[in-house]
């Protein structure tokens, strides 16, 4: 049954990926979100500024908008990870068919990449995501945004000051 459960979950995950891609590329809201979550030079500058701040080498901390580098890195890591694990999974699922067109070394590498991508996803979920969403002092015992779709105005002001000021200027807050 393990194989059936694994493949059923894989089909569900790939369907979510396809739906998400269509939503982000074809809907007005999705296109707006894609622009917001797109990695820019500023995200890398913010990352290094935050590292300098955390090491006591700078007194300034980045002023994040709707998404900071953490959210963007996590989003793109998850999206590319799901794409990679889907492609390698399809190749492995159709192993006999794949062997007709691909050299054995490609299948061997596909098996390695598929396994390590799954392990990497598990480790990132266990440590990074668990800390940011549940254990970080600003959200402990959990960030309720996943339940309500909303964040507290004070939390927004502290964690994403540029977004807070934008929304305040628009009269939303």
List the model feature ranges, each with a label.
Residues 1-173:
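Membrane-embedded alpha-helical bundles that constitute the cytochrome b-like, heme-associated redox core
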